[in-house]
């Protein structure tokens, strides 16, 4: 009985250690979206996307496939909503809208399948820099 328990416990530990961790999702904290928010990249599907989520795992921005241009409008709305609480001026909104494609340009040309965690962090920081200057 003791051997069976030891064997069972050993197998359990081995399975826990050997269980695969998804290498297709990379996350990096995003200063722009506030504490606890991350920019996550998921490459499980043919269309890779970024999604912004908070520490309660609530989706904040959107699922944004890169090859669907209509999602640019949805992303504009998400960014606009982030700004609305701080500054409701027309000037701020027009600057956000005029620069939104620059934000997309950073992510569009990445080879997402080969992007490592440090690269995800780098591009999240670059997005933050763009957001701060909108």
Language-model features, listed with the residues they occupy:
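Positively charged n-region of N-terminal signal peptides that target proteins for export
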Residues: 1-4
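Composition-driven detection of intrinsically disordered, low-complexity segments
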Residues: 7-8, 91
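Cleavable N-terminal signal peptides
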Residues: 10-11, 21
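Sec-dependent signal peptide cleavage junction
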Residues: 17-25
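Domain-level detector for secreted/extracellular nuclease and nuclease-toxin modules, and
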Residues: 24-73
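Extended amphipathic alpha-helical heptad-repeat regions
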Residues: 64, 68-134
């Amino acid at each position: 009985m003791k051997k069976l328990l030891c064997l069972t416990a050993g197998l359990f530990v081995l399975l826990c250690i050997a269980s695969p961790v998804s290498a297709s999702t990379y996350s990096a904290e995003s200063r722009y979206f506030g504490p606890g928010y991350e920019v996550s990249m998921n490459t499980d599907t043919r269309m890779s996307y970024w999604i912004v989520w908070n520490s309660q795992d609530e989706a904040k921005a959107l699922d944004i496939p890169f090859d669907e241009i209509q999602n640019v409008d949805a992303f504009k709305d998400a960014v606009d909503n982030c700004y609305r609480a701080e500054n409701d001026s027309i000037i701020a909104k027009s600057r956000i809208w005029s620069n939104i494609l620059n934000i997309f340009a950073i992510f569009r040309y990445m080879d997402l399948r080969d992007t490592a965690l440090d690269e995800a962090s780098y591009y999240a920081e670059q997005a933050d820099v763009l957001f701060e200057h909108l």
